[in-house]
Every structure is written in C-alpha cells, then in structure tokens.
C-alpha cells in the first residue's frame, strides 16, 4: 500500500499488481473506492484495518475486476444507480461487452476465464451515489461510456482525479501496461457506449487534473495531462 496524495492510499494487487483499490481518509476510518479482484480480499482487509477500518465500499462500476473484494469486506456497498443491476447480477461479463471485437484471438479466449477468476460474485448494493454528491472530501462525477454508471472522484484543492476505467493505462488488447505517460480510452469491446466513453475522457481532460489515478497501473502525473488525455480520447 502506498500514499498517493493527502488522505489517499493505493493498494495494488493481482495480475502484475495492476488492479487498484483506493482508500480515502474519512474521519476515524476510510472509504474504499473500487474493490479490485477477488484475490485481493486478504490484502484489502489488512490495509483497511491499518487505516482505522473501512466504513463503506463505493464501486466505480460493476465490472468483475472492480467488484471482486466488495462482498467480503463486511460493510455497506454503494454504486451509481445505473450500475445496481449489473452489480447485483452474478454474471462476470456485462451484457454489453463484445469480446469478439478484441483483435487478438489468444486474448479473446483468455478473458472469459480471467473475468471469472477476478470476480467476487454478486454484490448486495445498500445505497447509491450520483453526480455532485461528496465522498470523503471528493466530488462524485458521472463518466458514462465504459459502463453506464461509471463514476469518478474529483478534488479541486489539489486537482486529483480518481477515475477508475474512464481512462486505461493498460493495453487491454495485449494484457500489458501502456508506455509510461500514455493513456487511452477503453477499447470498444468493453464499452456500453464507446462514443460516450470518449466524451467522458474529454470531460476529464477539461478538468486539467494534476494527477489521474486510474483503475489499473500507477497514477498518471505530469504537466501536460490535458494534452495526454485529449490524445487518449482518440486512441480507438
């Protein structure tokens, strides 16, 4: 676990430590944002305990690699209203995903296995969060596209964006990280609405963040993040 900003800790785990779970300081405990993969349950529990205990889990969206620890944390779980049905489903592959669109056959074949491996199963959703609400000092922003109810968190004071899969810092078509300093819009194979996914990346770019914490790999930092994100929106 590493501290990535004031009151924000990142736990990386599973496949080449590319799955990210964030803990946000909230009074005498923490809020967990995103839930990584099922293999991270033990480390997520330990991290939460070290930080004073987790109060609730907030899912950025309901994909298998972002809900994995949620059923096992023993606290209320929240998500955007448009993600509730998928979060409470036992399906590891969202109904709108088109894995046949991935360009390389070996990757197309392995993803169904990986998604089942990462998934912690159906999640009981205890409440919802929407655009404009506040979580641990962050503003909730709705970034639809990759998933219908994908949300990110924005803190104006240090221009910190925690955005899960609004942008990818990995090449999901090859299962490897992108070169340092690069980002992309998620591949259309994963998207509920790819055009909206690109619009969401443009919206993120317009915020002019100083740091972007995504759902996979290390935070993206630099002086020209707006330009990086604008290029990312047109990657696919």
Regions of interest found by a model, annotated:
Residues 49-53, 133-136, 156, 207:
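Glycine-rich phosphate-binding loop signature in dinucleotide/nucleotide-binding domains
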Residues 1-47, 153-169:
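Conserved beta-strand hairpin/beta-sheet module of binuclear metal-dependent hydrolase folds
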């Amino acid at each position: 676990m590493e501290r990535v900003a004031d009151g924000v800790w990142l736990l990386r785990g599973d496949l080449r430590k590319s799955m990210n779970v964030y803990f946000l300081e909230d009074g005498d405990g923490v809020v967990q944002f995103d839930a990584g993969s099922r293999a991270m349950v033990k480390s997520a529990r330990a991290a939460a305990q070290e930080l004073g205990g987790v109060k609730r889990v907030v899912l950025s969206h309901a994909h298998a690699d972002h809900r994995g620890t949620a059923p096992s944390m023993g606290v209320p779980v929240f998500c955007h209203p448009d993600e509730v049905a998928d979060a409470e489903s036992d399906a590891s592959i969202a109904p709108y995903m088109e894995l046949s669109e991935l360009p390389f056959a070996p990757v197309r074949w392995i993803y169904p296995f990986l998604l089942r491996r990462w998934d912690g199963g159906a999640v009981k959703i205890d409440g919802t969060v929407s655009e404009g609400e506040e979580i641990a000092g962050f503003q909730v922003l709705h970034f639809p596209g990759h998933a219908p109810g994908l949300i990110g968190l924005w803190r104006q004071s240090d221009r910190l964006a925690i955005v899960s899969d609004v942008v990818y810092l990995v090449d999901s078509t090859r299962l490897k990280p992108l070169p340092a300093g690069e980002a992309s819009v998620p591949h259309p194979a994963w998207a509920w609405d790819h055009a909206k996914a690109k619009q969401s990346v443009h919206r993120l770019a317009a915020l002019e963040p100083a740091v972007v914490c995504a759902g996979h790999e290390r935070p993206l930092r630099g002086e020209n993040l707006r330009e990086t994100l604008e290029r990312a929106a047109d990657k696919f």
